Amino acid sequence: KDHILATGGNCEIVVGNSADLKIIKSLVQKAVDSFGKIDLVVANAGITTFGDFFEYQPESLRQLLDVNLFGSFFLVQEASKVMKEQQTGGSIVLTSSVTGHQAHPFLAAYGMTKAAIEQLAKNLVIDLSPLGININTVAPGATLTERTLEDKDYLSTWSRITPMGKPATVQDIAEAMIFLLSPQARHITGQSLVVDGGWTAVGVSPY
């Protein structure tokens, strides 16, 4: 927030569980109250859990489904209701993953949720296009974040197997989203923009 304000922007923060419909509704209402309207939506909340398929537990799956699917679905639904009333169109981006496109060891459950996000965006083209709202996904591959860098081998491993020689940065992912939210992408909808340095083209497993 400090960075946004320091660079001339404005923002509001709503803290809560992204899988809680009450929180989702309050977030959307806060945006309307603070800024007057909603033009752009990014559904970025998500969690990753690794696990052997044969050992995966119901509690872990429910948590994945709640955050990755329930939260994204109802954020888009609530925001789209506002955008529909405004009658001014808009753009929506959902965060997917390369695991929604391609099999990955130990990520069967996570990949399932991200494939569902991909299909959600495609299906919502039917509902949102008549309203002038486009909806797309960004599917990151290996990305350098505070969490991924906790693995001391992450950078070297993914640099070795990524055709472009390095993982993505957070900025790489953000700029892909900015493009899909921009007027330059106004006739793009129902698509997935994969940002993975070419990894899915060759599909070399890190394991």
Task: Tell me what each language-model feature is.
Residues D52-F53, S60-L65, W158:
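Substrate-binding pocket helix/loop in short-chain dehydrogenase/reductase
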Residues P130, T137, S156-I188, V195-G197:
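C-terminal helical subdomain
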Residues F53-F54, Q102-A108, P130, G165, ...:
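Active-site loop immediately N-terminal to the catalytic Tyr-X3-Lys motif
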Residues Q102, I178, T189-Y207:
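Short C-terminal tail/terminal secondary-structure segment
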Residues S97:
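Residue(s) in the substrate-gating loop at a strand-loop-helix junction
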Residues K81, E85, I126-P130, R186:
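Alpha-helical segment proximal to the catalytic Tyr-Lys
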Residues V76, T113, A121:
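Active-site helix of classical SDR
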